[in-house]
């Protein structure tokens, strides 16, 4: 079992984030112990949290992550959509870079003609 402090330290997240996941029901503590009802998480919960963090890093929204976690058969479709969105973003960035490169080349050519 891991405490909130251990999980936050090991996975680089804040207590606020972990408590938020509990509040919205995406990741509940395995047990609550002692008078303070301290939250503790077993290895399965830690693995689930690692998935949540990876999915967020990949651009999934929490509702999408909830669907993936509750309906594993939905994972492929959701991840395919995320890949499509990321590819669209890459294409947009590439077009912007190409436009900037053209503007720089035009600017350089214009500077050369004035000499």
Please give the residue ranges for each predicted region.
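Short, charged amphipathic alpha-helical surface segments
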Residues: 53, 65-115
């Amino acid at each position: 079992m891991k405490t909130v402090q251990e999980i936050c330290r090991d996975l680089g997240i804040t207590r606020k984030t972990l408590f938020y996941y509990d509040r919205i029901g995406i990741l509940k503590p395995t047990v609550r112990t002692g008078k303070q009802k301290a939250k503790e998480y077993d290895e399965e919960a830690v693995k689930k949290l690692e998935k949540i963090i990876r999915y967020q890093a990949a651009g999934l929204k929490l509702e999408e992550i909830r669907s993936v976690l509750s309906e594993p058969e939905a994972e492929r479709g959701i991840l395919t959509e995320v890949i499509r969105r990321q590819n669209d973003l890459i294409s947009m960035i590439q077009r912007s870079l190409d436009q900037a490169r053209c503007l720089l080349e035009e600017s350089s050519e214009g500077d050369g003609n004035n000499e």
